[in-house]
Swiss-Prot record:
<feature type="binding site">
    <location>
        <position position="171"/>
    </location>
    <ligand>
        <name>ATP</name>
    </ligand>
</feature>
<feature type="binding site">
    <location>
        <position position="198"/>
    </location>
    <ligand>
        <name>substrate</name>
    </ligand>
</feature>
<keyword id="KW-0418">Kinase</keyword>
<dbReference type="GO" id="GO:0009229">
    <property type="term" value="P:thiamine diphosphate biosynthetic process"/>
</dbReference>
<keyword id="KW-0808">Transferase</keyword>
<dbReference type="InterPro" id="IPR029056">
    <property type="entry name" value="Ribokinase-like"/>
</dbReference>
<dbReference type="GO" id="GO:0009228">
    <property type="term" value="P:thiamine biosynthetic process"/>
</dbReference>
<keyword id="KW-0479">Metal-binding</keyword>
<feature type="binding site">
    <location>
        <position position="125"/>
    </location>
    <ligand>
        <name>ATP</name>
    </ligand>
</feature>
<comment type="pathway">
    <text>Cofactor biosynthesis; thiamine diphosphate biosynthesis; 4-methyl-5-(2-phosphoethyl)-thiazole from 5-(2-hydroxyethyl)-4-methylthiazole: step 1/1.</text>
</comment>
<feature type="binding site">
    <location>
        <position position="50"/>
    </location>
    <ligand>
        <name>substrate</name>
    </ligand>
</feature>
<keyword id="KW-0067">ATP-binding</keyword>
<keyword id="KW-0547">Nucleotide-binding</keyword>
<comment type="function">
    <text>Catalyzes the phosphorylation of the hydroxyl group of 4-methyl-5-beta-hydroxyethylthiazole (THZ).</text>
</comment>
<dbReference type="GO" id="GO:0005524">
    <property type="term" value="F:ATP binding"/>
</dbReference>
<dbReference type="InterPro" id="IPR000417">
    <property type="entry name" value="Hyethyz_kinase"/>
</dbReference>
<dbReference type="GO" id="GO:0004417">
    <property type="term" value="F:hydroxyethylthiazole kinase activity"/>
</dbReference>
Length: 262
C-alpha cells in the first residue's frame, strides 16, 4: 500500500486558489462548533453560512459553492432539513461533504448517514472509528472520540471511497486522504488540537470548501488537512493551553493565507 505525501507547493497553490474563489459554504453543522467553524472558514478567506430551516436549507444549497452535513447534534427536524439540502445539492450539482460524527456509537445517526450515502457525497471526513463504522467494518468509537488508529482505517476508507465515489478523509495523528486508489498522508499537528472542541468539525467545513475548487480534488482535500495541521503547530508554539490555542489557531490560518499572496 503506497502512501504519497502532499508537497508544500501543492498545498500553497490550493490555498491561493481557495482565496481567489472564496467559496460560499453552507454549513449544516452541530450546535457546539458553529462559531469556531465559521471563524475557521473566514480566516482562510471563505464565506460561511449556517442555514438550517428546511425550506431555506434547500433553497440555499442551490446557490452555495459547497454544502457541509455534520450530524453531531442530530435531531429529526434537522435530519429533515439535511435531507432536503442534500437532495437539492445533488440536483444543483453542488458538492457536499458528510461528517458522520459518532456514527459508530449511535443507531439513529448511523441509519441516517447510511441513507445519505445513497446521494453520493463528494467527500466524507471522519476519525478512524467513524469511517470504519460507516464502511460496515466495525461499530465503535467512544462517543465522538475514536478508539482506532487512523492507519487501521485505510482499507475501510478505500472501500468507502470506491463504493460512493467520494474522497474519504481519515483524521488522526496522521491524516489519510483517498479516492479509493491513491492515498495521501498528511503529517503534523499537535495533540493539543484534540483538547479543543471543533477542530475536526471545522476541518470538515474546509474540506467541503475545497471540493468547490478547480483542479485535482484529492490534492485539494489533502491540502485542507495540511493547512489545519500547519496552523495547529504554529498555534501550539504560542499557546499555554486550550484556552489560548483557539485565537492563535485562527491567527495562524489567516497568516497562511497572507503568505501565499505575498
Amino acid at each position: 500500500m503506497q502512501v504519497d505525501l502532499l508537497s508544500s507547493a501543492q498545498s500553497a497553490h490550493t490555498l491561493h486558489l481557495f482565496h481567489q474563489h472564496s467559496p460560499l459554504v453552507h454549513c449544516m453543522t452541530n450546535d457546539v462548533v458553529q462559531t469556531f467553524t465559521a471563524n475557521t472558514l473566514l480566516a482562510l478567506g471563505a464565506s460561511p453560512a449556517m442555514v438550517i430551516e428546511t425550506e431555506e436549507a434547500s433553497q440555499f444549497a442551490a446557490i452555495a459553492s459547497a454544502l457541509l452535513i455534520n450530524v453531531g447534534t442530530l435531531t429529526q427536524p434537522r435530519a429533515q432539513a439535511m435531507r432536503a439540502a442534500v437532495e437539492q445539492a445533488k440536483s444543483s450539482q453542488t458538492p457536499w461533504t458528510l461528517d458522520p460524527v459518532a456514527v459508530g456509537a449511535l443507531d439513529y445517526r448511523r441509519r441516517f448517514c447510511l441513507e445519505l450515502l445513497s446521494h453520493k457525497p463528494t467527500a466524507i471526513r471522519g476519525n478512524a472509528s467513524e469511517i470504519m463504522a460507516l464502511a460496515g467494518v466495525a461499530n465503535g468509537g467512544r462517543g465522538v472520540d475514536t478508539t482506532d488508529a487512523a492507519a487501521n482505517a485505510i482499507p475501510a476508507a478505500q472501500t468507502l471511497a470506491r463504493e460512493t465515489g467520494a474522497i474519504v478523509v481519515v483524521t488522526g495523528e496522521v491524516d489519510y486522504v483517498t479516492d479509493g486508489h491513491r492515498i495521501v498522508g498528511i503529517h503534523g499537528g499537535d495533540p493539543l488540537m484534540t483538547k479543543v472542541v471543533g477542530t475536526g468539525c471545522a476541518l470538515s467545513a474546509v474540506v467541503a470548501a475545497c471540493c468547490a475548487l478547480p483542479g485535482d480534488m484529492l490534492e485539494n482535500v489533502a491540502s485542507a488537512c495540511h493547512w489545519m495541521k500547519q496552523a495547529g503547530e504554529r498555534a501550539v508554539a504560542r499557546s499555554e493551553g486550550p484556552g489560548s490555542f483557539v485565537p492563535h489557531f485562527l491567527d495562524a490560518l489567516w497568516q497562511l493565507t497572507q503568505e501565499v499572496q505575498a
